[in-house]
Structures are given as structure tokens and as C-alpha cells.
């Protein structure tokens, strides 16, 4: 009976450790995805802020040659 208790406790302990590791990896993956989304959004904002400058440059060139 004592052997079965020890085996059961060992199985439960190893299961909890495994579950903890999986949850930690999942959390890290979610954090990396969130960081990637934030990076993508900031790149998009930078690109969108350049559009008016590009339009002004094109219109200035057109006025110069036109």
C-alpha cells in the first residue's frame, strides 16, 4: 500500500511539474506574440506618418518640373 501511495504521489508531482512548464512556455509564447504585434503596429504608424512627407516631396518635384 505504501508503494502505491509513493507511486501515486510521484505521478501527481511529475504531472504538476509538466503542467507548470507547459503553462510557462505558453505564457512566454503569448508575450512574444504581443511584442510582435506591438512592433508591427509601431512600424505601421511610422510608415503612415511618412506618407504626407512623401506626398509633399512629390508635389514639390512636380512643381519644379511642371
UniProtKB/Swiss-Prot annotation:
The keyword Heme does not apply. Disulfide bonds: none annotated. Residues 30-41 have a biased composition (Acidic residues). Residues 1-22 form the signal peptide. Keywords: Amidation, Amphibian defense peptide, Antibiotic, Antimicrobial, Cleavage on pair of basic residues, Secreted, Signal. It is found in: Secreted. InterPro entries: Frog_antimicrobial_propeptide, FSAP. It holds the Pfam family FSAP_sig_propep. GO terms for cellular component: extracellular region. Expressed by the skin glands. Residues 23-44 form a propeptide. Residues 24-44 are annotated as: Disordered. The modification Phenylalanine amide is found at residue 65. It comes from the Eukaryota. GO terms for biological process: defense response to bacterium. Belongs to the frog skin active peptide (FSAP) family. Phylloseptin subfamily. Has antibacterial activity against the Gram-negative bacteria E.coli and P.aeruginosa, and the Gram-positive bacterium S.aureus. No hemolytic activity. This is Phylloseptin-H5. It comes from Pithecopus hypochondrialis.
Amino acid at each position: 500500500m505504501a508503494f502505491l501511495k509513493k507511486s501515486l504521489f510521484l505521478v501527481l508531482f511529475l504531472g504538476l511539474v509538466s503542467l507548470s512548464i507547459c503553462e510557462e512556455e505558453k505564457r512566454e509564447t503569448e508575450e512574444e506574440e504581443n511584442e510582435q504585434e506591438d512592433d508591427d503596429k509601431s512600424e505601421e504608424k511610422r510608415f503612415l506618418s511618412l506618407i504626407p512627407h512623401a506626398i509633399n516631396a512629390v508635389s514639390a518635384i512636380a512643381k519644379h518640373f511642371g
